């Protein structure tokens, strides 16, 4: 994808206040990357892994551009999300916290001119991004985020822009993170910070920088999705910037992992893909006469990066780091004592769900855990677990959220959950189904097949209490909570701390709304703790306990008990499950 712009006449007016250049032609190239998410190494870090896009492959591409254009004529920028989201950054973020962080060293090796802090970089937490920013500063690379403001003084927590000289040309690079960061992550990750909308802030900053620094070229790098350009989404302000900015040559965006390039009037915008698979290139030609820029040409394109063509010198330079990361990723972190079968959750309390509840209850002293299955019909085999297996054991990027719920609200929550799960049946009869299933066309086979009527991602059960679910009763009267797991009284008007996932906390499944929390403000007002990703909790659980043992995670005085009644119900639901998945 390639776009070319030629701007003349008014260009002289736009840059008349810039610092003087000698008459002649100046040719620069802006190479832009983003959303690498820690895919730094060309070789796979997992046992049995396959080669894929990498920072080292991007480095080879950048080397080629520099060889063609001249190193002093190439500007290298990144739109963020570089040190969070995969195994390699996890190692340097949370395991080896005493060595110098790898990302600043990699960025220095590639000679980045400026890097933006993406939303995932903030998600790593203060200890990580503060450390990375400090080390990048030592390497001479600014970590930019001009709209991340300190609550203490209202000023940018990270620099808003950087001035660089390339080929005699003065270039201003302004950098911004996602304006919706506060709603995209746990509040503790960004404590003491607030995030401003990019509109009108970026234009205001551009005007100030042009007045103060008098650059010849202005680049805005923002970790924001392209969006629709309608000004309605804080998380997606890329096209808003593209349509409204004046005095800017190049806008680089990220966050949505898209691969796009567009142009209009005197500006181009590029969205740089993900995980080392793409790079943007904008060739800029300035023509100077009488000390003024009288025309400029912008030629923007997106390039696919070949994973097999990587920087072998860079690979050799960081071989020791690769070895440390691979050793950690492929190393044993714990053991699962007995295989866990997820499909059992449909019709009874099971080891698999006890394990999920135990994870939440191990991370914070909650009264009750509320959770749905992660595997619709799967198995977690017994045996050793390597770090690279943690994503298989816990396949989603959920985080722990703890909030206050009354006993009455918990009861309503569970009633709504089981209503999505089961039909009312007073007695068993032929061709009846307790589990809510239906027949519909399977488009992979063209045949009719049994499917769940509702998503099992919203089939929450509870731990920490003892209760029954009566399938003969209608919605609103099925769940009977007898007492707490430890035998103490369960009270409808008492407040309890309950563990849920971030998926549930944003309203997914409608269970909190059914409990009486009508909107996000109602939920936010009840939150008492925001925890880490459950994968991190699982890793810590293994490090502390060594294993997942059903005999330990299923202790009745901790997780409590629940069951379907009357006696025919579990067998009837099991038969329905076998219609779905076979015996």
Predicted region positions:
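Acidic, metal/ion-coordinating pockets
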Residues: 19-308, 347-359, 369, 529
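Hydrophobic h-region of N-terminal signal peptides that target proteins for export
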Residues: 10-19
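Sec-dependent signal peptide recognition
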Residues: 2-8
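Catalytic centers of hydrolytic enzymes
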Residues: 21-29, 33, 38-48, 52-64, ...
């Amino acid at each position: 994808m390639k776009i070319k712009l030629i701007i003349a006449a008014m260009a002289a007016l736009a840059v008349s206040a810039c610092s003087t250049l000698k008459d002649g032609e100046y040719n620069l190239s802006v190479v832009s990357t983003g959303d690498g998410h820690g895919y730094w190494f060309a070789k796979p870090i997992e046992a049995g892994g396959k080669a894929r896009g990498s920072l080292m492959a991007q480095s080879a591409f950048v080397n080629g551009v520099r060889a063609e254009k001249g190193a002093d004529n190439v500007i290298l920028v990144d739109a963020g999300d570089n040190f969070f989201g995969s195994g390699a950054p996890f190692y340097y973020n949370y395991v080896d916290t005493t060595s110098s962080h790898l990302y600043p060293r990699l960025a220095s090796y590639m000679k980045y001119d400026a890097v933006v802090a993406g939303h995932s970089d903030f998600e790593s937490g203060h200890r990580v991004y503060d450390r990375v920013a400090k080390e990048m500063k030592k390497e001479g690379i600014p970590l930019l985020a001009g709209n991340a403001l300190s609550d203490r003084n209202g000023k940018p927590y990270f620099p808003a822009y950087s001035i660089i000289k390339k080929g005699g040309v003065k270039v201003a690079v302004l950098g911004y993170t996602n304006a919706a960061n506060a709603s995209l992550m746990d509040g503790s990750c960004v404590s003491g910070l607030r995030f401003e909308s990019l509109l009108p802030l970026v234009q205001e900053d551009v005007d100030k920088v042009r007045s103060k620094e008098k650059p010849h070229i202005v680049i805005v790098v923002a970790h924001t999705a392209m969006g629709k350009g309608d000004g309605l989404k804080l998380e997606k302000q890329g096209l808003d910037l593209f349509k409204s900015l004046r005095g800017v040559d190049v806008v680089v965006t990220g966050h949505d992992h898209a691969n796009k390039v567009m142009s209009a009037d005197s500006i181009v915008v590029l969205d740089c893909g993900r995980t080392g698979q793409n790079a943007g290139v904008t060739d800029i030609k300035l023509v100077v006469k009488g000390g003024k820029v009288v025309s400029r040409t912008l030629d923007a394109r997106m390039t696919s990066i070949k994973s097999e063509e990587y920087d072998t010198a860079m690979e050799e330079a960081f071989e020791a780091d690769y070895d440390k990361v691979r050793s950690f990723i492929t190393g044993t972190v714990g053991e699962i004592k007995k295989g866990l079968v997820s499909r059992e959750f449909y019709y009874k309390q099971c080891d698999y769900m006890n394990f999920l509840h135990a994870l939440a209850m191990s991370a914070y002293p909650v009264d009750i855990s509320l959770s749905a299955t992660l595997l619709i019909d799967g198995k977690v085999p017994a045996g050793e677990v390597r770090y690279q297996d943690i994503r298989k054991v816990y396949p989603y990027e959920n985080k722990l959220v703890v909030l206050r719920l009354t006993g009455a609200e918990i009861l309503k929550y569970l009633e709504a959950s089981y209503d999505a799960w089961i039909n009312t049946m007073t007695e068993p009869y032929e061709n009846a189904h307790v589990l809510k299933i239906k027949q519909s066309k399977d488009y992979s086979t063209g045949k009719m097949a049994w499917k769940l009527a509702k998503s099992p991602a919203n089939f929450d059960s509870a731990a920490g209490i003892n209760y029954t679910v009566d399938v003969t009763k209608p919605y609103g009267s099925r769940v009977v909570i007898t007492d707490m797991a430890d035998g103490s009284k369960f009270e409808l008007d008492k407040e309890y701390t309950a563990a849920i996932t971030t998926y549930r906390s944003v309203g997914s499944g409608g269970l909190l709304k059914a409990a009486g929390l009508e909107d996000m403000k109602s939920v936010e007002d009840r939150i008492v703790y925001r925890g880490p990703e459950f994968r991190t909790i699982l890793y810590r659980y293994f490090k502390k306990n060594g294993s997942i043992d059903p005999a330990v995670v299923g202790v009745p005085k901790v997780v409590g008990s629940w069951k379907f009644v009357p006696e025919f119900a579990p067998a009837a639901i099991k038969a329905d499950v076998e219609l779905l998945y076979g015996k």
